[in-house]
From Swiss-Prot:
Pathway: Amino-acid biosynthesis; L-proline biosynthesis; L-glutamate 5-semialdehyde from L-glutamate: step 2/2. One of its GO terms (molecular function) is glutamate-5-semialdehyde dehydrogenase activity. The gene is proA. Its EC number is 1.2.1.41. GO terms for biological process: L-proline biosynthetic process. It is found in: Cytoplasm. This is Gamma-glutamyl phosphate reductase. The keyword NADP applies. It catalyses: L-glutamate 5-semialdehyde + phosphate + NADP(+) = L-glutamyl 5-phosphate + NADPH + H(+). It holds the Pfam family Aldedh. GO terms for cellular component: cytoplasm. It comes from Shewanella pealeana (strain ATCC 700345 / ANG-SQ1). Belongs to the gamma-glutamyl phosphate reductase family.
Length: 421
């Protein structure tokens, strides 16, 4: 079987499986998800062992620490993933919900109802937890899913999908509701992007190269996002003591994820007092800095190492303990910098001036905009959406963390009495 035949079979099987999924009741889907959670718990030793093999191979192949952190699925993280399944079970099922209805003058009773998309293709890199997160959200919303993870996570993904597929069969459903492309051949990615006869939406979760590939080659609607060049602006009216804690959380808590902080913009009135305090605190936590000329002069006087920032560094999603620092004259300058370099993911302002905060929120056009909060909150779980499929930085069909509703569409239902036009 060549690649085209293989992908066609995947697509046909997924489409066929999606029909039965779309008719499941909320209770049936909850029972399925509980079965998956129980089976994952029972198989945790095998799953962790498979992940340890992936991690060992990654280290042997010289992958970066950031990539290895994304790849890791130890027992603690796995149990967190399983706990998220319980959270999703508790969420309201959007499928079947009536969005609106009305009686038309012609006698038709017209309504709009949420329905599954059908088949979703997801392409992602070194994050095995995504395998479970996406499968669970897809099944909760009655969608079949075709998964293509990175070759670095192949052993982990095989172990996870084996368990999920066994749960499908146990619940009387086709195992093809969840399928994994387990061939690392990159040509299969391009083929999947053109499988528009069977796949209704593609979600790429990865870096700029993957996003660009999908945007250029897909004949299927694609949800772009996941690249987070995130900013925090420290305003003239900010509480500087509290600001340090927020910036630490946004940068240090988990620097390898897309909602981690990349650049801090500091109002000029605070530059000399605040930047040294912030840099000393963060450097003690292992953070390295790129700064504008003013920042370099301030930190140079304090004997704190800082590299020269430029457009390239401001355009970088660091995914590591590296931080850009820039002094700005005012709110307008901060907003202009964000408009120039942001990926449209998450931005925050730290200020006690409500009018400035409102101006910032209105002026910044990103998926999530915060006042006096860390960018780390841009997450499906934190937003109460359950585990997320992705964080979309586009405006159609979804924006920000994609929860259950983002995996549905709607159809028009019209009741008549043998009505003619």
């Amino acid at each position: 079987m060549n690649n085209d035949e293989y992908l066609t079979a995947l697509g046909q099987n997924a489409k066929q499986a999606s029909y039965a999924l779309a008719t499941l009741s909320g209770q049936q889907k909850s029972a399925l998800l509980r079965c998956i959670a129980n089976k994952l718990t029972a198989a945790k030793d095998d799953i962790v062992a498979a992940n340890q093999q992936d991690v060992a191979d990654a280290k042997a192949n010289g992958l970066s620490d950031a990539m290895i952190d994304r790849l890791l699925l130890d027992e603690t993280r796995l149990m967190g993933v399983i706990s998220d399944i319980d959270n999703v079970i508790g969420l309201t099922d959007p499928v079947g919900c009536e969005i609106d209805s009305r009686l038309l003058d012609n006698g038709l009773r017209l309504s709009r109802r949420r329905v599954p998309l059908g088949v979703i293709g997801v392409i992602y890199e070194a994050r095995p937890n995504v395998t479970v997160d996406i499968a669970v959200l897809a099944l909760k919303t009655g969608n079949a899913v075709i998964l293509r993870g990175g070759k670095e996570t192949l052993s982990s993904n095989k172990a996870l999908c084996k368990v999920i597929r066994s749960a499908m069969v146990e619940q009387g459903l086709s195992e093809d509701c969840v399928q994994l492309i387990d061939n690392p051949d990159r040509a299969l990615v391009s083929g999947l992007l053109k499988l528009d006869k069977y796949v209704d939406m593609i979600v790429p979760r990865g870096g700029q190269n993957l996003q660009r590939l999908c945007a250029e080659q897909a004949t299927i609607p694609v949800i772009l996002g996941g690249i987070g060049i995130c900013h925090i602006y420290v305003d003239a009216a900010a509480n500087l003591e509290k600001a340090v804690a927020v910036i630490e959380n946004a940068k240090v808590q988990r620097p390898t994820v897309c909602n981690a902080l990349d650049t801090v913009l500091v109002h000029a009135s605070h530059a000399k007092a605040f930047i040294p305090v912030l840099a000393k605190h963060l450097s003690g936590l292992g953070v390295k800095f790129y700064g504008c000329e003013q920042t370099q002069a301030i930190l140079g006087a304090e004997k704190i190492e800082v590299s020269a920032a430029d457009d390239e560094s401001y355009s970088t999603e660091w995914l590591s303990l590296t931080l850009g620092l820039k002094v700005v004259a005012d709110l307008e300058s901060a907003v202009e910098h964000i408009r120039t370099f942001s990926s449209g993911h998450s931005e925050s302002i730290l200020t006690d001036n409500i009018h400035t905060a409102s101006e910032f929120m209105n002026a910044v056009d990103s998926a999530a905009v915060y006042v006096n909060a860390s960018t780390r909150f841009t997450d499906g779980g934190e937003f109460g959406l359950g585990a997320e499929v992705a964080v979309s930085t586009q405006k159609l069909h979804a924006r920000g963390p994609m929860g259950l509703e983002a995996l549905t569409t709607y159809k028009w239902l019209a009741w008549g009495d043998y009505t003619v036009r």
